[in-house]
Design a protein with these regions (language model features):
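Contiguous surface segments at macromolecular interaction interfaces
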Residues: 1-31, 35-57, 62, 73-78, ...
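Non-catalytic, usually N-terminal nucleic-acid engagement modules in DNA/RNA processing proteins
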Residues: 67
Length: 184
């Protein structure tokens, strides 16, 4: 069989494979994908930024896996983490509480917040940087599917394209077997 035919077969089986394996204990096809500016993505992966800010988000992601997409010019999946806790509060209180873990200056924080009356502070833990950042162009080629990065975030399991992309990224990075998973 040609490589293309074999690869197509692999991609068809990928969702089942992804459910059977994990990175850091999290399924490869669950969680949320966050778009992050490259400078902040790098700080998160280095452990220098432990709080990610969002103007809009959902508390349903607390305790869940988060995958990071570094926006242009990097345009790559860079790693993942777990959202330990989500705090929603007035911007002044968020800054006061987390300024040393936000990874930006007060001026940049204020510019981002703008006129928002509340902001979400996502406490990140269990950060797993990918050994090599995986460019969206490489994933688009491997999946033969255009990937449109989310403006802010999206559910991985609700996006067939991103579910496949994140699964491939996990396979390229390295995976471990889920305890108790069924045999393939």
């Amino acid at each position: 069989a040609s490589f293309k035919a074999v690869w197509k077969s692999v991609l068809e089986k990928l969702p089942k494979i992804a459910r059977e394996f994990s990175i850091a204990g999290y399924s490869l096809c669950d969680g949320v994908l966050l778009s992050v500016q490259p400078e902040y993505a790098e700080r998160i992966m280095e452990g220098k930024k432990r709080i990610e800010l969002r103007k809009k988000f959902s508390r349903k992601w607390e305790g869940e896996r988060v995958c990071f997409y570094a926006s242009r010019p990097v345009a790559a999946l860079v790693g993942e983490a777990r959202i330990r806790k989500i705090n929603v509060d007035k911007p002044a209180h968020i800054w006061e509480t987390y300024y040393s873990d936000i990874g930006s200056s007060k001026d940049k924080f204020d510019a981002y917040v703008g006129t928002a009356t509340e902001i979400y502070a996502l406490e990140l833990t269990d950060v797993v940087p990918y050994r090599n950042w995986i460019p969206i162009s490489q994933l688009t080629h491997l999946l033969d599917n255009d990937l449109v990065p989310p403006q802010s975030y999206c559910s991985i399991q609700n996006s067939e394209s991103w579910s496949a992309a994140v699964s491939v990224a996990g396979l390229l990075h390295g995976i471990t077997r889920n305890p108790g998973a069924m045999a393939l």
